[in-house]
Amino acid sequence: MTELNKLSVADSLKGLKNKEFTSKELVNAHIKQIEKHKNLNAYVTETFDLALKQAEEADQSYAKNHSRTLEGIPFAAKDLFCTKGIRTTACSNILREFIPNYESGVTQNIFNKGGVMLGKTNMDEFAMGSANITSCFGNVISPWKALDDGADLVPGGSSGGSAAAVSGFMATAALGSDTGGSVRQPASFTGLVGFKPTYGRCSRYGMVSFASSLDQAGIFTRSVLDSSIMLEAMIGFDERDSTSIKMEVPQLQPAIGSSIKGMKIGVPLSLGEGGIIEPDIMKMWHSTIELLKDAGAEIIDISLPHTKYGVAVYYVIAPAEASSNLSRYDGVRYGLRVEKENMSLDEMYEITRSSGFGDEVKRRIMIGTYVLSSSFMDAYYLKAQKVRRLVADDFNNAFAKVDAILLPSAPTEAFRIGEKQNDPTITYLNDLFTIPASLAGLPCVSVPAGLSNRGLPLGMQVIGKQLDEYNVLRVASAIEAGVKHIKFEPVGF
């Protein structure tokens, strides 16, 4: 029998319903794995007592044949989802000891469906980063190692702890957040399925904000089916979130294994010009195209001319929104407060924020404040918003001809910890292919599609029309089926 912590969400549910094992046994298997691999630094807060209590309640539900859709399934949550009575830090010193008195909309939805929380996962501070190297709790180490040198690799970011937890079999699934690629890029780096739904599908209530017009909850799983199961539990209207979409929760599981014959899939191959993409990833892109052709899809060459400006636009809009959102951390109402004798209020603000925020967060606050200043708002912020509209128009024009779009999740494979740390613009470019869909608020998924010459996982990204998670899952499922001969599992786990 497969080790319990290696079971998928679907297989775990099947085993629990058939009384093959208990939720408590399932949780204990994950706790054992977490304890074994603490060196990866995937978790910042462990909630084992809560998990075991929830598991016992789940086992009682199964005994009475009254189980819910996620009854007894162990999951982890990125540490920016507020959890009532449980420390929520966004991995920043300014919130290091913050304990919220309310529950986020997404975690509440999962609890309502019977989910069991193992703990809160590490992340880049305030979700600002692409390598999980800006956390106040230290770097996350990927479970994966390259075949050539075995060096420690980044798991991607900002949801690197969640990616490491699921990839390392320390959680069956894990919540992440995706602002410019923070679920899809780590999923690509760690051989996982990483799904970001349409903006507004999942409640942002109780999520620590980075950039409010871009932030969206996402999910890491080890299969496309698991992704559909988790999404059905996460999605739902929340009146406490003004951007929440008031629609019925869609049935997504039927998309898995559904034929893609006749589907039109757009491929913007021109984005691969100029040597930006590593050769292994270009090779995977072309092989995935052939795979989808063999499955009956029609491949159509499309143009997304304004996506080349996506990174520049994102790094104006996101820091601008961050500078506004993070102004609330002033040492007065909650979080860190640094005081000295005879200190003025302005001095308290300055010292508290200087002590509480890390370098990357300070950098983005400064950029955001600059582009919002009266002298530069027209030249930068308003212009960026206009180009954002053009990026969205490119997608609308493409979706008039195609059902989904295929492109790589990231231009590179996972890199060594510290390798790109000295130049932040290099890590910013890792979101080159994920940012455009975020700017347009589209549903998208990264699905493992191959291995590099160094034995590292590579992900392909499927982007769909707004609210069309179903077809995104259809295409992702076809890709998954086409590469089922490849084992996306780190050695030693």
Curated annotation (Swiss-Prot):
Gene3D superfamilies: Amidase signature (AS) domain. Allows the formation of correctly charged Gln-tRNA(Gln) through the transamidation of misacylated Glu-tRNA(Gln) in organisms which lack glutaminyl-tRNA synthetase. The reaction takes place in the presence of glutamine and ATP through an activated gamma-phospho-Glu-tRNA(Gln). The lineage of its organism: Bacteria, Pseudomonadati, Pseudomonadota, Alphaproteobacteria, Rickettsiales. GO terms for cellular component: glutamyl-tRNA(Gln) amidotransferase complex. It comes from the Bacteria. Pfam families: Amidase. Belongs to the amidase family. GatA subfamily. It catalyses: L-glutamyl-tRNA(Gln) + L-glutamine + ATP + H2O = L-glutaminyl-tRNA(Gln) + L-glutamate + ADP + phosphate + H(+). GO terms for molecular function: ATP binding; glutaminyl-tRNA synthase (glutamine-hydrolyzing) activity. Heterotrimer of A, B and C subunits. This is Glutamyl-tRNA(Gln) amidotransferase subunit A. GO terms for biological process: translation.
